[in-house]
Structures are given as C-alpha cells and as structure tokens.
C-alpha cells in the first residue's frame, strides 16, 4: 500500500501529544520511509513574519498582501528549522518534487520570493519541519490503530479553516468525531 497523496488522521487514542488530532499530508512513502506535512497546527508566526526574518530579495511588487497574513504551519518535529512549501503545480520551482499532477513540495527559497506577488502558486501552504517515519515504522503504527488513512482531498488542505481540518478529514471517511473512542482494540 502506497500512502503518497494520502492523509494520516490521528485517532483519539494517539498517545504522542505532538500528534494528537493531527492531519498529515503524505508527500512520500516507500520502503525506506515516509515524509509528510502536518496541515492543521499553526506556529506563532505569520508568513510575512517568517519572510521578513529570511530577508528575501523580492524583485516583484507585493500585490496580494492578504496572502502573507496566513499562518505558517508546524509540519512536524523533524528539521523544524527548515521551511517546506506544499504548492499547486503552476510553475517549475527549483527543487520542487512533484507529489501528484496537481501538487508539489519544495524547500527552495525561490518559491518564497514569489509569495504575495503575481508569480505565487495558485494554492500553497508553508510549514516548518516535517513528519517522518523510518521504513516500517508507520506501518506498525497503522497496525496499532494509531492513524486512519484516506486519499488526500486538496480542499481540506487549502480551503478548509485550519482548526476544522481534522474534523473535515474524518467526515470524508463518514466518521463523526464524537463517535470515536479513545480506546483501541482488535477483533
């Protein structure tokens, strides 16, 4: 089972407080491991604040200042000092890795310089850090009923308010979060 372009949705039984009520978009999954971005936990800095700290040379005028007020997300505990941009495939950015026909992920600064300008991707989110698992580690967690999985829906990533993404992902599975138990078991 390849989980690339899927969501991991934390079950209420999740013991790790970092991942409780998390939704993680899986960018890469193979026998060597898994890499994803948590899409529903903001950090205490706006995109503009982060860009100001980086001091990018921005050759284009800012024409969409409202897009710079969006929060930066906490993508996960690995490399949490590094920015990751999940974006629609509008243009080719340096080092972008295509996840699907519609989405790519990059750590390249060239895309950051386009944010707020006419050259920005149609849809994007910025996260600090990523969530990672060694080969077989995620599969073990799945067998322990720690996560639910479903095919990713870009509307959850880009169009659903951040606090509602966990609930929305569960609803796509036909699950009412109020009906989930924090107890786990196997039949």
From Swiss-Prot:
Native source organism of the sequence: Aliivibrio fischeri (strain ATCC 700601 / ES114) (Vibrio fischeri)
A cellular-component GO term for this protein: cytosol
**Which protein, by its recorded name, is this?**
UPF0301 protein VF_0434
Going by the entry's taxonomy, the superkingdom of the source organism is recorded as Bacteria
List the SUPFAM superfamilies hit by this protein, alphabetically.
VC0467-like (SSF143456)
Pfam families to which the protein is assigned, alphabetical: DUF179
Query: What protein family does this chain belong to?
Result: Belongs to the UPF0301 (AlgH) family.
